A protein has these predicted regions:
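Catalytic machinery of carbohydrate-active enzymes
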Residues: 1-312
Length: 312
């Protein structure tokens, strides 16, 4: 997600360039119909493990060697991504100054980035090294998404994405249930990937583990408001709408929060517009989002998603 605006600016600067994007298959649907990308080269990382890894890795390396680009841009900044650039036969490899795991040794040009910068701002600096000109308007050429079968677009609903890979960033079952209860009778659609089970109230549409990435994008575009923990889907929402609240327990919203000045963030019991983050005083040490925090959030969201008269 964070790389989309950078690649869009590179395309504007180099309209005749042949751009190939190396990407993990699970995120490849984000590039469907992207006018800035000519080719998608899948990196099936999960298949390169175990006893049969060589049988998959060797053919992939052979195909990757055929790419031979004039320039490879390492937006990930890891040894693995730098090695992919090297294997591709790129004439030059550009990366960022905060790259890790020794990946900087592979770079021919290094973009100077600051520690406290947002990921998007860091990636834009790398794009500048490739000739892009950064302006205030950024493009996120996301697909429109795929409709979810048997899902009614009306009445309006709130989309809740409460799960993250880090357990400490996820919302508890009690918070999810309290969130649904406070917004009844308005529908609360719960999405995401999780093995956890919770007791969904009557107004909850429980879609955990039941949506593809493209179906999730479709739901994000339809939702009256989105509440999400710090995650990939949150960043998708930030690119689509400002009707978003991003919940940050331990992460710094200045660095990894929504890159949308009109979106909202929650941190340590505070609700702030993203545009207020530069001057706001926020405690570095975070805490979990608790059931006592739900009414505070509900006061923000309820005026934006009023109860449909047909439900009263």
């Amino acid at each position: 997600m964070h790389t989309l605006p950078a690649v869009a600016l590179i395309r504007e600067a180099c309209p005749e360039a042949d751009i190939t994007w190396v990407i993990n298959p699970e995120w490849a649907p984000l590039l469907r119909g992207n006018p800035d990308v000519n080719h998608v080269h899948l990196f099936p990382r999960g298949e390169f493990r175990g006893l049969g890894a060589a049988g998959t890795l060797l053919p992939w390396l052979k195909q990757t060697r055929k790419l031979r680009p004039d320039l490879a841009l390492d937006f990930q900044g890891l040894l693995r991504s730098a090695l992919i650039g090297k294997v591709s036969g790129a004439k030059e490899i550009y990366g960022m100054s905060d790259a890790r795991e020794g990946s900087r040794w592979f770079y021919d040009c290094i973009a100077k980035v600051e520690h406290g910068e947002h990921a998007i701002e860091r990636y834009l600096k790398l794009a500048e090294c490739a000739g892009a000109r950064v302006n205030e308007i950024l493009r996120y050429p996301l697909p429109s998404g795929d409709p979810l079968p048997r899902f009614d677009e009306h009445p309006p609903f709130i989309l809740l994405h409460p799960f993250a890979r880090g357990r400490s960033k996820s919302l508890s079952n009690a918070v999810i249930e309290e969130f649904c209860r406070l917004f009844a009778p308005t529908r609360v659609v719960v999405v995401g990937q999780s093995y956890r089970k919770f007791a969904p109230p009557a107004n909850c549409v429980e879609l955990t583990n039941q949506t593809s990435l493209l179906q999730l994008i479709w739901l994000i575009r339809l939702a009256g408001f989105i509440v999400s923990v710090d995650s990939g889907p949150m960043h998708i929402a930030a690119a689509v709408t400002d009707r978003l609240l991003s919940i940050h327990t331990w992460t710094d919203p200045r660095r990894v929060g929504p890159y949308n000045p009109d979106a909202w963030i929650w941190k340590n019991g505070q609700l702030l517009h993203v545009s207020e983050l530069k001057t706001a005083k926020i405690r570095r040490r975070g805490r979990r989002f608790k059931t006592k925090d739900v009414p505070f959030v509900a006061e923000l969201i309820r005026p934006l998603v009023p109860v449909d008269p047909m439900l009263i």
